[in-house]
């Protein structure tokens, strides 16, 4: 898939990022992971980010990363494009991106670098190095320590032809509007705030109609119902789901640091497609919190 073809894929439909399955000893569990992908396929996500943030990329060893991407590609080949996560320091991110390309992934999501703050010059050099190390399409994730400005993205757009996507996980309205107006149609724009459904309407108004859904992992029917309503301008359905499910869900998610991943794994277990525990430093939901989530999910009906 060429970078331009990947850009076209990312400009419509619901995107998601599958959980990574671990066993009780916290080892990667390839068979349940493949079964998860098979279960999700009929719901119709336009692309999946394998080994992304919700897939606990940050906890994977290099060998495990290769296994995760390979299972995703083998399971979804010919049906759902697989975009691999890549991140860390520049040389490490290059290694992940090149491995994903070698395995046959359709593109890569460049996750924020680790720990240290960086200047705009440093961020530009980092993204350029990763883009120049591969031929397939790259989407950069503006989040955490990676806060690219409109001017920096303009430089990257001119120097990295395979940089085709911009995912926003910061939520600064002024900055995003400036980026969207400065770069125009050069990128595919993705909403990437946690529990993106709550912000989908605002992002659509700013010229970003596409987002990635974490809840697709455990309430895929509802996730697609929300996306279809969002795409059709059915604000009544979107408002109902935000009010009845997503806002209480966010309140539960915010009870502890790292729960943005943990709550999704808890939901997958409740729906009958468990992905095992999260790896440290994340922690699983407490029993009472799981019960709260179960009550919320029950209101949505069968998935």
Swiss-Prot record:
Its EC number is 4.2.1.41. The keyword Ribosomal protein does not apply. Coiled coil: none annotated. It comes from the Bacteria. It is an enzyme of class 4 (lyase). InterPro entries: Aldolase_TIM, DapA-like, Dehydro-deoxyglucarate_dehyd. It catalyses: 5-dehydro-4-deoxy-D-glucarate + H(+) = 2,5-dioxopentanoate + CO2 + H2O. One of its GO terms (molecular function) is 5-dehydro-4-deoxyglucarate dehydratase activity. Keywords: Lyase. Pathway: Carbohydrate acid metabolism; D-glucarate degradation; 2,5-dioxopentanoate from D-glucarate: step 2/2. GO terms for biological process: D-glucarate catabolic process. Pfam families: DHDPS. Belongs to the DapA family. This is Probable 5-dehydro-4-deoxyglucarate dehydratase. It comes from Leptothrix cholodnii (strain ATCC 51168 / LMG 8142 / SP-6).
